[in-house]
Amino acid sequence: MGMPVEFNTLIVTKGKEVRIDENIFTLEKDGYRVYPMEIPMDVRKTKFGEKSGTAEVQKLQWEEGRTIITYKLTSLHSVN
């Protein structure tokens, strides 16, 4: 039996990101997801919303049907 997995090329936060340090955040998502590591990608609050920044995923964890990413915000386009 295969494992369902989703490949993502942008980070959609839906306002659920948690600040760990000045520009380091974690985000927990349902299901197993793959993100490019250490590659700049857009950060958005919603899938079709405006770009709020650019980030690079530094750590990717899978556990109990969830994905946890740790990413570094490299630029901010909006404070709202």
Curated annotation (Swiss-Prot):
<dbReference type="InterPro" id="IPR019699">
    <property type="entry name" value="DUF2584"/>
</dbReference>
<dbReference type="InterPro" id="IPR015947">
    <property type="entry name" value="PUA-like_sf"/>
</dbReference>
<protein>
    <recommendedName>
        <fullName>Uncharacterized protein YtmB</fullName>
    </recommendedName>
</protein>
<dbReference type="Pfam" id="PF10763">
    <property type="entry name" value="DUF2584"/>
</dbReference>
